[in-house]
């Protein structure tokens, strides 16, 4: 990669050549941001990001999946450009939000792929609402039982990295996640 291309790298460069839309929908009273690609006549594939993530986590996947699915990547409640409530979020809040989103786009069923927190949410949806899930794909899914001390440490590191995205704090969070 030459210096000019390094200077102009962007997450949006991954979407170059991909026919997609970006927008917001009201999912049960929650303004929800999405990236959408693919054919509405095909089965829905919903992509759920991890803690502190956003829809762009799947920017490199949209084009390939759009050939076979009606693909939606969302900013889950409390993340990205979607609404942020004034209360702590628990898994049932995320599950309700995702189900309302599916209802809003008219999807009775969907293939759901989740990464980290998104995997935890996806697996909870599959367990509680199996009639809504065609296929479940879990990528480094969070557990169904979280240790409060581990979750507190994850929250502290994530907030620190978000409020001061210096190399030191980002590195500390990633190293902790990979330990």
Predicted regions and their residues:
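Short beta-strand element of the alpha/beta-hydrolase
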Residues: 42-50
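The serine-hydrolase catalytic nucleophile loop
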Residues: 50-63
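Alpha/beta-hydrolase active-site loop signature
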Residues: 52, 76-80, 143
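An N-terminal hydrophobic leader/cap segment in hydrolases
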Residues: 1-24
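Active-site loop/oxyanion-hole signature of alpha/beta-hydrolase fold enzymes
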Residues: 18, 25-37, 42, 60-63, ...
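Flexible "cap/lid" loop of the alpha/beta hydrolase fold
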Residues: 120-128, 133-169
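Alpha/beta-hydrolase
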Residues: 177-179
């Amino acid at each position: 990669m030459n210096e000019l291309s390094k200077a102009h790298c962007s997450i949006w460069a991954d979407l170059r050549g991909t026919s997609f839309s970006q927008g917001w929908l009201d999912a049960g009273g929650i303004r929800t941001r999405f990236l959408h690609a693919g054919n509405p006549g095909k089965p829905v594939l919903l992509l759920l990001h991890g803690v502190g993530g956003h829809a762009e986590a799947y920017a490199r996947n949209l084009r390939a999946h759009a050939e076979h699915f009606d693909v939606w990547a969302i900013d889950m409640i409390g993340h990205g450009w979607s609404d942020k409530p004034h209360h702590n979020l628990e898994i049932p809040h995320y599950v309700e939000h995702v189900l309302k989103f599916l209802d809003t786009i008219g999807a009775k069923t969907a293939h759901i792929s989740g990464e980290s927190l998104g995997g935890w949410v996806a697996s909870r949806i599959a367990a509680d609402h199996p009639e809504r899930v065609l296929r479940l794909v879990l990528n480094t899914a969070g557990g169904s039982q979280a240790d409060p001390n581990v979750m507190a440490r994850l929250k502290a590191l994530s907030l620190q990295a978000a409020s001061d995205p210096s190399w030191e704090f980002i590195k500390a969070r990633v190293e902790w996640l990979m330990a």
